[in-house]
């Protein structure tokens, strides 16, 4: 007998923290949720992992604006999972950076992963209508 994922019943809000973990290095975390990291550079910021939706990404953006007025120039995607990348459009970044392998996996299974994670993590996708589509890297590396 198959059972559903425990995460489908996880609808309670999580406590979010935004902590400086090093000079100009911040961690956006919530228990059990995807994390984002932020580096504040000389003329802009880099965000690592975008969050599941633009609405969730806006929570990261609010925290970044509380510590700097520098623009978010780049979003780096660590891998292709929907809960980490579909919020990228909210940043209006100069570039979306990912490995060539991440790009390949988005092509191969991005929509399938989105559909799967949407069903498994309803709390993370409460604002799914804000997602304009799959996230495509504009800069790739090996």
Annotate each predicted stretch with a short phrase.
Residues 5-20:
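Short acidic, Pro/Gly- and aromatic-enriched capping/linker segments at domain boundaries
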Residues 10-12, 30-32, 132-133, 138-140:
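Short solvent-exposed loop/turn micro-motifs enriched in small/polar/acidic residues
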Residues 62-141:
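Active-site HxH/HxHxD metal-binding segment of metal-dependent hydrolases
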Residues 4-5, 29:
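Hydrophobic small-molecule pocket/channel-lining residues, especially in calycin-type beta-barrels
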Residues 18-63:
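Conserved beta-strand hairpin/beta-sheet module of binuclear metal-dependent hydrolase folds
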